[in-house]
């Protein structure tokens, strides 16, 4: 009997997850929504108990049991939210949850408003995904476009001394005068003499 089998007896069997990334994102986002709805309901209950306590002057909260959650999503609304959640890319799941929590902390919505807030965050994330995808597509098109280098540009005209085709008055005068003596630091450009 080998020692390896004894060492592996307490390890969990390694199995690959059969869930797709979209399913995992869906489950994570819907769990976040459910948890935040429970938390909003608890806060709403605490606020109503505090108001009741101020109005009556007596605290009977120790006597009452915690009621079950009273608000739940309708099946149609749940399916619509799940349909939107499936479209979210896994890399945007974390930022979507952070944005949702940030809005909940800022606004402190009622339980009924939490699902609409969640839907608005998901729409915002989908818009951001679409914008980044378009920017990435433009970047890819730009990088795949053939570029011309400076070495491929060829001059169409060479710089060389040439005789002008346009006759001027000063040209007749210049033709009869001998060319000036050049200085040794400058190259000499002369038109070829036609014999």
Swiss-Prot record:
It is linked to Leber congenital amaurosis 12: A severe dystrophy of the retina, typically becoming evident in the first years of life. Visual function is usually poor and often accompanied by nystagmus, sluggish or near-absent pupillary responses, photophobia, high hyperopia and keratoconus. Changing residue 130 to M: In an individual with cone-rod dystrophy features; less effective in suppressing GUCY2D activity by GCAPA. Changing residue 93 to V: Increased the affinity of RD3 for GUCY2D. Keywords: Cell projection, Coiled coil, Cytoplasm, Endosome, Leber congenital amaurosis, Nucleus, Sensory transduction, Vision. Expressed in retina. Widely expressed (at protein level). In the retina the strongest immunoreactivity is detected in the inner half of the cytoplasmic portion of the photoreceptor layer, where rods and cones are found, and the external half of the outer plexiform layer (at protein level). It holds the Pfam family RD3. Plays a critical role in the regulation of enzymes involved in nucleotide cycle in photoreceptors. Inhibits the basal catalytic activity and the GCAP-stimulated activity of GUCY2D and GUCY2F, two retinal guanylyl cyclases involved in the production of cGMP in photoreceptors. Involved in the transport of GUCY2D and GUCY2F to their target sites in the photoreceptor outer segment. Up-regulates the activity of GUK1, a kinase that also plays an essential role for recycling GMP and indirectly, cGMP. Plays an important role for the survival of rods and cones in the retina. The lineage of its organism: Eukaryota, Metazoa, Chordata, Craniata, Vertebrata. It comes from the Eukaryota. Changing residue 68 to W: Less effective in suppressing GUCY2D activity induced by GCAPA. The keyword Phosphoprotein does not apply. GO terms for biological process: negative regulation of guanylate cyclase activity; protein transport; retina development in camera-type eye; visual perception. Monomer. Interacts with GUCY2D; negatively regulates its activity. The interaction with GUCY2D promotes the exit of GUCY2D from the endoplasmic reticulum and its trafficking to the photoreceptor outer segments. Interacts with GUCY2F. The interaction with GUCY2F negatively regulates GUCY2F activity. The interaction with GUCY2F promotes the exit of GUCY2F from the endoplasmic reticulum and its trafficking to the photoreceptor outer segments. Interacts with GUK1; up-regulates GUK1 activity. Changing residue 32 to K: Reduced the affinity of RD3 for GUCY2D. Residues 170-195 are annotated as: Disordered. It is found in: Cell projection, Cilium, Photoreceptor outer segment; Photoreceptor inner segment; Endosome; Nucleus. One of its GO terms (cellular component) is nucleus. This is Protein RD3. Residues 23-52 form a coiled coil.
């Amino acid at each position: 009997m080998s020692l390896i089998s004894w060492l592996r007896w307490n390890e969990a069997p390694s199995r690959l997850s059969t869930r797709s990334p979209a399913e995992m994102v869906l489950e994570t986002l819907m769990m976040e929504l459910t948890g935040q709805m429970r938390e909003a309901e608890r806060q709403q209950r605490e606020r109503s108990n505090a108001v009741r306590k101020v109005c009556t002057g007596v605290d009977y909260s120790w006597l009452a049991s915690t009621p079950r959650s009273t608000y739940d999503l309708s099946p149609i609304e749940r399916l619509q939210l799940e349909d939107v959640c499936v479209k979210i890319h896994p890399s945007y799941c974390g930022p979507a949850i952070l944005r949702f929590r940030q809005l909940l902390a800022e606004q402190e919505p009622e339980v009924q408003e939490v699902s609409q807030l969640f839907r608005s965050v998901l729409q915002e994330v989908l818009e951001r995904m679409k914008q980044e995808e378009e920017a990435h597509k433009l970047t890819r098109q730009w990088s795949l476009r053939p570029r011309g280098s400076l070495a491929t540009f060829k001059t169409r005209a060479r710089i060389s001394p040439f005789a002008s085709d346009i006759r001027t008055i000063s040209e007749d005068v210049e033709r009869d005068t001998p060319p000036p003596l050049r200085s040794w630091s400058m190259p000499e450009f002369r038109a070829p003499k036609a014999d």
